[in-house]
Amino acid sequence: MSRIEKIIAREVLDSRGTPTVEVELWTEFGGYGIAKAPSGASTGENEALELRDGDKARYNGKGVLKAVANVNDKIAPALIGHDVQDQLGLDRVMIKLDGTEFKKKLGANGMLAVSLAAAHAAASELEVPLYRYIGGVQAKRLPVPMLNVINGGEHADSAIDFQEFMIMPVGAPTFKEALRWSSETFQALKSLLHDKGDITAVGDEGGFAPHFSWAYAKQDLASFKAKTPAEIALDLLVEAITKAGYKVGKDGIMIAMDCASSELYFEDKKYHFKKIEKVTGQEWAFTTEEMIAYLEKLVNNYPIISIEDGLSEKDWDGFVQLTEKIGDRVQIVGDDLFTTNPRFIKEGISKDAANSTLIKLNQIGTLSETVEAITMTQKAGWTAVVSHRSGETEDATIADLAVAFNAGQIKTGSMSRSDRIAKYNRLLQIEDQLGEDAIYDGYATFYNLKINK
């Protein structure tokens, strides 16, 4: 047993220049841990609360001094003297101290930073890597990365309503090679955009945020019958993969999408593509049935292996229909739908509303609750995708967690911005440490799809 001796929280900045919480934690026998909380732009309505100050005179109301004070004045006194290796116990102390379902009193940003700092300190004291401390000797599976190379939606000032278009190097033999393939494809995409006269500025997660004016000029803007912005993006990805010299498909690189459809869903229960409407000057909206048909069309025409939040978090029946329609050949990932909350994941499993869960630690607020969410997901035969948020820092904890949980997939941005690259570099270190024991499943990571049986 090693007791927690000191906890200090402070306000620092994330990748958007927005405040977040950093926590340092020390133990009596020299253990030390540090962690920072991430922050999302498009958030599910059932996420744990990210406590902000609301003082418009500081950071436009986005300061986190309240959350910092809660750590220093309330959480720290409650945890000093607690066994740092009792992760479940110390998380329960914070949960009880908060007393609300969605961490509305203390704030999930402060609680998560404490929870992760404690895990880092425990691993430090035992002189083992974090992935080994949490996952034990079985932690040796490197995740297939989902690299967000085209940004849209809330993550970028681009022409695309869907939020993320990602490449997945499923045919690579190792994680190291997977990153090389991805980097070369990213550079090929940049070259293509440049040649077409489009911008190569990047969004919050390091992917490009094109305007597609070159494509709009060639078709009927009023109908988009030729190509929708999503199809233009998908065509570009296929072209970039080929230009980089790789195969398109399971022996090379496949595509994943995050539609972030909760952001498109309005009171009329239709999905409104506001960016298309801005270009055309006309309403562009889908019913649930039309949205499912549109997604199925994309899957039929492009090498798409994963769709996240294809429908709104309020459209549970639609998710069931979508999973029934294409869930045997495509990973249907619930993000806003489940918010890493075991209660909602359990409901999703019972309804067959998806076949995969996105894991975002700050949606639930503690490491032990995250473990519960992943365990529940995997026991159901679903896949788990460990994920960053659009507001990140140099903290690379999720890289260790992806390996610790043998998750098989990680979603942590593109091949630019050091807040994203930090996670990939950490995974390269882990792969090197594991040596011949390192496993990279590639396409086999989609073990629950019929195409792999």
UniProtKB/Swiss-Prot annotation:
Binds a second Mg(2+) ion via substrate during catalysis. GO terms for molecular function: magnesium ion binding; phosphopyruvate hydratase activity. One of its GO terms (cellular component) is extracellular region. (2R)-2-phosphoglycerate binds at residues 163, 360, 389-390, 411. Pfam families: Enolase_C, Enolase_N. Mg(2+) binds at residues 258, 308, 335. This is Enolase. It comes from Mesoplasma florum (strain ATCC 33453 / NBRC 100688 / NCTC 11704 / L1) (Acholeplasma florum).
